[in-house]
């Protein structure tokens, strides 16, 4: 098993650079493999943009892998995003993990000039163009439905070859098939229940076999929202308050977190592992950086040892 931790992104009362630097270096000391952000451009809580924060985090760390799960890449220009990904991978000396998804549901595509009728096709084509930009070819030619590029010089290239690992977020069977076709790994959403994740993993494994992909080379992870508290009822209240800050009143979200005493949380995480997770992205939902730091310490000392 591999364990990663979320990187706090909330920026309400001002950015606490020293506090976050201490959090990141402590995550390395505690042995977490990675630190991950998420993307939410429009939402009820102000969050620092993920890639920019990862670039800052790269300067604060030396071994921690740096990830985002997930970027809604259909909302971004692919060449600009490819350049940003390259920059963060180079600044971190090859430590970036890139999570992608086309979006859907309540996404306000029109605000970004994206056609809701074609966003999935545009997403897939955009990912193909990004891979072309990251390739060893010094000049890129690409002709698609949405974009035309002729003999365009693109440099530099990412440190990781052929590109940073691409993690897909997906729930529907067709989306999972797309993840296997175009991705390197799968990250179950924090907003999905353990049972929904288990179902997705079964579909994923079937797709890996049907597409003749090596299941040992396709890593499976899940973001898990959680709170550890000696009072189980208080833990539940705290984790639900955290979910409201991220998702507002999204239906069904109350069923997704793991909360309670250290034993309760270990039990809930064991269920996620049994469902197929090889990487756990542990996402405390404290009310601020200090609470998230305390949660990280408790996870490392009281929960993870029960899982190993």
For each feature predicted by the language model, list its residue ranges.
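Active-site-adjacent structural elements that line small-molecule/cofactor binding pockets in enzymes
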Residues: 1-308
């Amino acid at each position: 098993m591999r364990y990663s931790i979320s990187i706090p992104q909330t920026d309400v009362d001002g950015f606490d650079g020293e506090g976050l630097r201490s959090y990141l270096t402590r995550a390395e000391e505690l042995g977490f493999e990675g630190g991950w952000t998420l993307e939410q451009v429009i939402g009820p809580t102000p969050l620092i943009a993920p890639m920019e924060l990862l670039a800052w985090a790269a300067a604060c760390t030396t071994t921690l892998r740096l990830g985002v799960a997930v970027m809604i890449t259909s909302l971004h220009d692919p060449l600009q995003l490819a350049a940003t990904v390259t920059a963060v991978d180079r600044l971190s000396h090859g430590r970036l993990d890139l999570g992608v998804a086309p979006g859907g549901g309540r996404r306000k595509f029109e605000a970004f000039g994206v056609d809701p009728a074609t966003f999935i096709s545009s997403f897939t084509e955009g990912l193909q163009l990004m891979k072309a930009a990251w390739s060893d070819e010094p000049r890129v030619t690409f002709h698609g439905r949405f974009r035309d590029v002729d003999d365009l010089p693109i440099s530099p290239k990412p440190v990781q070859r052929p590109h940073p690992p691409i993690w897909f977020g997906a729930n529907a069977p067709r989306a999972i098939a797309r993840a296997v076709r175009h991705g390197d790994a799968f990250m179950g959403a924090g907003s999905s229940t353990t049972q929904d994740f288990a179902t997705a993993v079964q579909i994923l494994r079937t797709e890996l076999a049907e597409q003749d992909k090596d299941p040992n080379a396709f890593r499976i992870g899940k973001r898990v929202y959680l709170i550890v508290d000696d009072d189980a009822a208080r833990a539940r209240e705290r984790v639900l308050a955290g979910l409201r800050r991220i998702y507002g009143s999204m239906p069904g979200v109350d069923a997704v977190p793991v909360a309670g005493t250290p034993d309760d949380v270990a039990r809930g995480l064991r269920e996620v592992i049994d469902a197929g997770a090889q990487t756990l992205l542990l996402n405390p939902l404290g009310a601020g950086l200090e609470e998230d730091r305390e949660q990280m310490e408790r996870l490392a000392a009281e929960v993870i040892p029960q899982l190993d």
